[in-house]
Amino acid sequence: MVAGIYDIFNHICEQYFSGEDDNTSDYIAEALMKSVIHSSLIAVNNPEDYEARSNIMWSATWALNTLISKGKLTDWMVHMLGQSAGAYTDATHGMKLAAVSLPYYRHILPYGLKKFVRFAIEVWKVNPHGKSDDEIAKEGLMKMEEWMKKLRY
């Protein structure tokens, strides 16, 4: 289940981190990420929770049908890196994405700082008060890593 959650989340991220867009697709992507975060923490602790699992699957439908990418240029580099890692390991698809996503996002952070700031504030509820944009963005990625660890990454 956890590998699938990482795959779903990265499908959303790779459509979301596409520039400094401020459109309906971004708002939907943020809501989907929040839903996946919320529901995944419940489902991992109680795999029998039908509501949590069904919300994850509903989010997966949106993540995979590319409606949230309309009007955007998208970046599927995390998936490409994950597939490349597949040549050297038999890890599941989602776990490969988990392994490469944070290093990749940290690498591209300077090029998409405004979007990573928005991600930190809107998705991870980072308090921006008294912090630089760089600090806010890095805190968002740190919170993403903390969530991944809670899922037993």
Language model features with spans:
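Conserved FAD-binding catalytic core of PHBH/FMO-like flavoproteins
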Residues: 4-6
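Conserved core segment of the aminotransferase class I/II
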Residues: 12
